[in-house]
A protein has these predicted regions:
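Residue-level signal for discrete positions within transmembrane alpha-helices
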Residues: 12, 97, 101, 137-140, ...
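Hydrophobic secretory-pathway targeting helix
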Residues: 2-24
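An internal, D/E-rich "acidic patch" concept
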Residues: 60-117
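Membrane-water interface segments at the C-terminal ends of transmembrane alpha-helices
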Residues: 23-29, 58-59, 73, 137-166, ...
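Hydrophobic alpha-helical segments of integral membrane proteins
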Residues: 9, 50, 54, 64-80, ...
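Alpha-helical transmembrane segments of integral membrane proteins
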Residues: 2-3, 94-131, 170-312
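Hydrophobic alpha-helical transmembrane segments of membrane transport/permease proteins
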Residues: 16-69, 162-179
Length: 312
């Protein structure tokens, strides 16, 4: 168990170094000057001397590898630098936006499970029947639709035409989270529904299900007492991947709905060339994704006693 933990920790650290180094390379090679964006406005032209002094204050005059090494050392102590656009520490700016993203992703996850699990099970139990074809077509459409396009359609129908929900929300509200959460849930839920269908179909063909049916056990009991307990592990694995996608993929949806979250913050940071904020966002996504994978891996041990004995 200790060796496995050490191995996972090593992979965690190496992955973080790789992701942050790549992000640093991209921001370093990106066209444009963040200092010029920071200082100049439409009515003001800043002297080259002021630009050079500001660049030196921010440490942007140093070689690339020195900048990266300084950032890694500071990040290890919880200091991700100052946001150019927000004029405050990156950590503080991200903590302001974090609740919005967590609420949106959490609500979308609930909608995803409520939609995908019943639809996937229903599709599997009615394989090659009309309801199966309808659900599979709907899931194909859901997977194929870009989130920004679906979001705009939902805004037009439920916001502009019907007036049931706000078109956009700059604050976190119960009504404001509905449309962006539904937008995410349709796309993510369609992916998950197809995986649920495949997992349930695979379990339905196994000997223990055939034997239970031969003994006259009801379909409901077979589903809830046999199929679903055995399908939990693969379904949790797939769900863990989708949760990671939710946390990292909310940026477009947050922008469309003006939702105050990390994704919206990151897109604004990109337009303003706010490199410390961009790097902080990428670090957050990487850590969140790897932590979710670690939790999924740990859940295996809790749900499957055989794995616990193997790793003891």
């Amino acid at each position: 168990m200790g060796k496995r933990f050490a191995k996972q920790l090593g992979q965690f650290i190496v992955t973080l170094f790789g992701i942050t180094f790549l992000t640093f390379c991209l921001t370093y090679l990106a066209p444009g000057d963040p200092v010029t964006m920071l200082l100049e406005t439409a009515d003001t032209i800043v002297s080259q001397q002021t630009i050079d002094e500001t660049r030196a204050q921010l440490g942007l005059d140093k070689p690339f590898i020195v900048q990266y090494a300084n950032w890694v050392v500071n990040a290890a102590h919880g200091d991700l630098g100052m946001s150019y656009s927000a004029k405050k520490p990156v950590v503080d700016r991200m903590l302001e936006a974090l609740p919005g993203t967590l609420i949106l992703a959490g609500t979308a996850l609930v909608f995803t499970i409520l939609y995908a699990l019943p639809a996937g099970i229903l599709s599997a139990y009615n394989r090659n029947k009309w309801i199966d074809y309808v659900l599979r077509i709907l899931s194909f459409i859901g997977v194929s639709m870009p989130t920004f396009w679906l979001g705009l359609v939902l805004i037009y129908i439920f916001g502009l035409k019907l007036g049931l929900v706000p078109i956009a929300s700059s604050r976190i509200t119960a009504t404001g989270v509905i449309l962006p959460a539904v937008t995410l849930a349709v796309v993510v839920g369609s992916k998950y529904m197809r995986q649920v269908r495949l997992v349930i179909l695979e379990e339905m063909q196994k000997d223990y299900v055939i034997g239970a049916r031969a003994r006259g056990v009801s379909e409901m009991k077979i589903l809830f007492s046999h199929i679903l307990p055995n399908a939990v592990l693969p379904l949790i694995t797939i769900l863990g991947v989708l949760i990671g996608w939710l946390l990292g993929g909310v940026a477009v949806v947050e922008m469309v709905f003006s939702w105050p979250g990390l994704g919206n913050m990151a897109i604004y940071a990109i337009t303003m060339r706010d490199y410390p904020l961009i790097e902080g966002f990428v670090l957050w996504v990487a850590i969140a994704y790897m932590c979710i994978n670690a939790l999924v891996d740990a859940s295996y041990v809790l749900l499957d006693p055989r794995l616990k004995r193997e790793r003891a």
